[in-house]
C-alpha cells in the first residue's frame, strides 16, 4: 500500500485522492484476489501439511532417490521435487523435505553441495509450476478465470515446454557437476549432523502416492467430464459463468478430497488434527497476502492515466497476442518479483484485450492460458 500511495503522489501529486485510491482501488484489487484464490491457498497449504505429517512426502522422495541411486543423484532429486509439487505439495515443504535427502545423495556421489539449491529448484519451481498440464500450482490456476480454461489447457505446448525445461536444466546441472569434478571439487567438508533424517517406518509408496493420484483424477474428471455436461446458466445470477469458475472449483474439490483421504487413513498417526489444520491455514496467509498486495498495487496502476501509455507500449511490441502476452507477463512478474502477483496484475489488466485479439486470429484461449502461465516463471526469479 505504501508503494501504491507513493506512485499516486508521483503521478498525480497530492491531489490524487490518496484515501479514495487506497480504500476503493487498492483494497478492491487486494480483496478480489483473496476472494478468488483463498480457498486454493488454504486447501493447498493444509494438503502440504498433511502430506508432511503423514510422512507421505518424505516416503515419495525417499523411494525415488533409493530407486535411482547415488549415480543419478541430480535426477533423483529433480524427479522427487517434480512429483511432489505436481501433486500439490507446496514449494517450501518440498524444499524442506528434499534438502536432507539431496545432501545425503550428493555427499555419497561427491557432487558439490552448492548445486543442491539449483537441483531442488529445477524439480519444484519450474515445469510443474507453470508448464505441466493438470498442475494445481497457483500459477497454472490464475489464467483459468480470465480465459475460461482449466489446468489441463494446451497440453501439447505444456508437455513440450516441460520436456525442454527438464532436459535443459538437467544438461546444465550435469555439466556443472562434471566440470566441478574435473577441477577437483567435491561435496566438501560440511558438517551435516543437523540435517540427518530418520527414514525408517515410512509408509509404503502406494499409500503415499494415492493422494496425488486422487487430485489428478478428480481434477481431470470435474474439469473435462462433470462441468462440461451441466447447465451453468444459473451462475448469471452471481455475475459469472461456469467456464470462468469450473477450473478453480475442480482443483478445490480435488485437493479437499485428498485432504479428507489423508485424514481418514491416518487417524492413529495424526494425533492433533486441529493443530495441523491451524498451521496449514496459517501457512497459507503469507503467500496469499503477498500476492494480494501486489495485485492491489496493480489495480492502482491500472486506474492511473499513465497506464494508457504502458498499455500502448505493451501492445506496440507486437500485434501477435501470444508474443505480447509472453513479454508483458514476464516483464510485470520481473518488476514485482512475484510469479503469482505479477500474473494476476497482467491478466487483470490485459487479458480481455488479448482474448479479443486471439479471437480475431482464431487462436485458442488455451494457448493464451499456457503462455501466460509459462511466462510467469521467467523474470520473477531475478536477484531482487
Could you tell me what each predicted segment is?
Residues 1, 34-37, 48-58, 85-97, ...:
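Short helix-coil transition sites and intra-membrane helix breaks within transmembrane domains
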Residues 8, 156-276:
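Long, contiguous bundles of hydrophobic transmembrane helices that form the permeation core
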Residues 25-58, 83, 243-308:
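Core transmembrane alpha-helical segments of multi-pass membrane transporters/permeases
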Residues 104-209, 368-371, 377-384:
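Membrane-core helix-loop-helix motifs of multi-pass transport proteins
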Residues 38-44, 67-104, 288-298, 315-356:
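Hydrophobic alpha-helical transmembrane segments of multi-pass integral membrane proteins
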Residues 16, 132-143, 148, 220-232, ...:
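Membrane-helix interface motif
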Residues 31-38, 64-79, 109-116, 153, ...:
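Membrane-interfacial loop-to-helix junctions in multi-pass transporters
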Residues 4-13, 41-46, 80-85, 123-127, ...:
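Hydrophobic core segments of alpha-helical transmembrane domains in multi-pass membrane transport
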Amino acid at each position: 500500500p505504501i508503494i501504491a500511495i507513493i506512485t499516486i503522489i508521483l503521478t498525480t501529486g497530492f491531489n490524487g485522492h490518496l484515501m479514495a485510491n487506497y480504500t476503493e482501488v487498492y483494497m478492491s484489487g487486494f480483496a478480489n484476489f483473496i476472494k478468488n484464490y483463498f480457498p486454493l491457498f488454504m486447501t493447498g497449504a493444509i494438503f502440504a501439511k498433511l502430506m508432511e505429517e503423514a510422512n507421505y512426502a518424505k516416503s515419495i522422495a525417499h523411494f525415488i532417490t533409493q530407486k535411482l541411486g547415488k549415480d543419478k543423484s541430480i535426477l533423483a532429486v529433480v524427479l522427487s521435487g517434480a512429483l511432489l509439487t505436481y501433486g500439490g505439495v507446496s514449494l517450501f515443504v518440498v524444499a524442506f523435505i528434499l534438502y536432507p535427502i539431496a545432501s545425503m545423495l550428493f555427499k555419497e556421489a561427491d557432487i558439490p553441495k552448492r548445486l543442491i539449491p539449483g537441483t531442488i529448484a529445477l524439480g519444484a519451481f519450474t515445469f510443474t509450476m507453470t508448464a505441466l498440464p493438470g498442475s494445481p500450482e497457483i500459477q497454472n490456476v490464475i489464467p483459468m478465470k480470465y480465459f475460461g480454461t482449466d489446468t489441463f489447457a494446451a497440453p501439447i505446448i505444456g508437455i513440450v515446454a516441460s520436456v525442454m525445461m527438464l532436459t535443459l536444466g538437467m544438461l546444465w546441472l550435469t555439466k556443472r557437476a562434471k566440470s566441478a569434478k574435473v577441477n577437483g571439487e567435491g561435496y566438501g567438508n560440511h558438517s551435516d549432523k543437523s540435517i540427518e533424517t530418520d527414514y525408517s517406518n515410512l509408509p509404503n509408496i502406494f499409500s503415499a502416492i494415492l493422494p496425488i493420484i486422487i487430485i489428478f483424477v478428480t481434477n481431470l474428471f470435474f474439469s473435462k467430464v462433470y462441468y462440461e455436461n451441466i447447465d451453468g446458466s444459473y451462475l448469471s445470477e452471481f455475475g459469472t459463468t461456469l467456464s470462468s469458475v469450473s477450473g478453480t472449483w475442480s482443483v478445490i474439490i480435488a485437493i479437499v478430497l485428498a485432504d479428507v483421504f489423508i485424514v481418514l487413513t491416518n487417524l492413529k498417526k495424526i494425533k492433533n488434527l486441529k493443530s495441523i489444520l491451524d498451521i496449514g491455514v496459517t501457512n497459507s496467509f503469507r503467500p496469499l497476502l503477498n500476492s494480494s498486495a501486489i495485485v492491489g498495487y496493480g489495480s492502482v496502476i491500472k486506474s492511473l492515466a499513465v497506464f494508457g501509455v504502458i498499455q500502448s507500449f505493451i501492445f506496440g511490441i507486437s500485434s501477435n497476442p501470444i508474443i505480447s502476452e509472453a513479454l508483458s507477463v514476464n516483464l510485470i512478474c520481473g518488476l514485482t518479483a512475484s510469479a503469482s502477483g505479477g500474473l494476476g496484475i497482467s491478466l487483470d489488466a490485459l487479458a480481455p484485450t488479448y482474448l479479443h485479439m486471439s479471437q480475431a486470429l482464431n487462436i485458442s484461449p488455451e494457448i493464451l492460458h499456457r503462455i501466460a502461465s509459462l511466462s510467469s516463471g521467467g523474470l520473477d526469479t531475478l536477484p531482487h
